[in-house]
C-alpha cells in the first residue's frame, strides 16, 4: 500500500476517533479520488479548493443578510454597541491572520499535517471545534513571527 493511502486512512481513522465528521469525510473523498485515479480533479482541488471552500463559508455566514426579516436599525445598533465594536476588531484581526496563514500554507503546504494533528488534539482534549486550516495557519504564522523577533 502506498504511503499516501496510509496517510489518508490514518486521517479517516483520526477523524472517526475524534468524532470529526469533516476530517473523516475529507479523508474518504480524497482516498476515493486517489483510488479512482481522478488526478485532474485532485489537481483542481489542490489549486482552487481553498478558494471554493472560502466561498461556501462566506455564503453560509452571509445568508442571514439575504433574508428580508432582518431589522437593519437593530443590526446597526448591535454593530455599534461595545460588543459589536469588539466583534468588528476581532473580525478584522482574524481575517488579517487568516491571510497570513494562507500565505504560509502556500509557501509551506506540508505544515497542514501538523495543523490537522493539532486540531485533533484540540478537539479531543480541549473540546474545540475544527473550523479549518486558515486560523491554525494564521496562529502558526504569528508564532513564527514572534520567534523571528526574538532571534
From Swiss-Prot:
Belongs to the UPF0756 family. It comes from Desulforamulus reducens (strain ATCC BAA-1160 / DSM 100696 / MI-1) (Desulfotomaculum reducens). It holds the Pfam family DUF441. It is a multi-pass membrane protein. This is UPF0756 membrane protein Dred_1097. The chain crosses the membrane at residues 6-26, 52-72, 75-95, 111-131. It is found in: Cell membrane. Keywords: Cell membrane, Membrane, Transmembrane, Transmembrane helix. The keyword Manganese does not apply. It comes from the Bacteria. Signal peptide: none annotated. One of its GO terms (cellular component) is plasma membrane. InterPro entries: UPF0756_TM. The keyword Cell cycle does not apply.
Amino acid at each position: 500500500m502506498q504511503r499516501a493511502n496510509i496517510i489518508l486512512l490514518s486521517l479517516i481513522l483520526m477523524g472517526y476517533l475524534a468524532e470529526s465528521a469533516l476530517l473523516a469525510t475529507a479523508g474518504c473523498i480524497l482516498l476515493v479520488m486517489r483510488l479512482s485515479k481522478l488526478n485532474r480533479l485532485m489537481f483542481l482541488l489542490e489549486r482552487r479548493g481553498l478558494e471554493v471552500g472560502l466561498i461556501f463559508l462566506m455564503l453560509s455566514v452571509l445568508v442571514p443578510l439575504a433574508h428580508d426579516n432582518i431589522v437593519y436599525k437593530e443590526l446597526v445598533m448591535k454593530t455599534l454597541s461595545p460588543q459589536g465594536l469588539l466583534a468588528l476588531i476581532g473580525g478584522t484581526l482574524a481575517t488579517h491572520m487568516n491571510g497570513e496563514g494562507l500565505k504560509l500554507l502556500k509557501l509551506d503546504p506540508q505544515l497542514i499535517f501538523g495543523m490537522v494533528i493539532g486540531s485533533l488534539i484540540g478537539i479531543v482534549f480541549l473540546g474545540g471545534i475544527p473550523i479549518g486550516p486558515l486560523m491554525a495557519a494564521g496562529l502558526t504564522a504569528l508564532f513564527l513571527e514572534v520567534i523571528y523577533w526574538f532571534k
